[in-house]
Amino acid sequence: PILALVTGKPVYMDDVAPKDCLVVKVLRSPHAHALIKEIRTDLAEKVDGIVCVLTYKDVPKRRFTMAGQTYPEPSPYDRYILEDRVRFVGDPVAIVAGETEKAVDMALKRIKVTYEVLDAVLDFHTAMDNPVLVHPEDDWKSLCPVGADNKRNLCASGVDGEGDRKS
């Protein structure tokens, strides 16, 4: 890989991955907003070479923010690693780790998910005070006072105005 790098040839992570590392992939939601009513992983777990299959039932329930600011982040702590509610197409549903990419791909196809599809908020112009809440949960929080209110679909709000320049 070093020679390829210095000669300007493309190098991919798979080119430098240790031979004994696991392949990890994520099953993602096909829905913009839905509840996971049932998720069956038993057939995926039986695939040769599969080491681990995780769903919302298996991961810690500790919220975090995905916004990427420094601490204390003004963006809301509104995400779990995996949860039983998906909020966008591509939201993670399950994580599979295995010895080969072929095994992981096969396991992903064997995970069976039953969704209750919900109305989605697809336009930020109509999101505020929409009856469809993106984050209806009670353990949602914002570390900084930026006007966040999950019961109004607000991750932040502000006020703009002019003061009295003569006083």
List each language-model region with its residue ranges:
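Accessory "access/gating" subregions that flank catalytic or transport cores
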Residues: 159-165
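Flexible, low-hydrophobicity surface segments
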Residues: 1-147, 151-154, 165
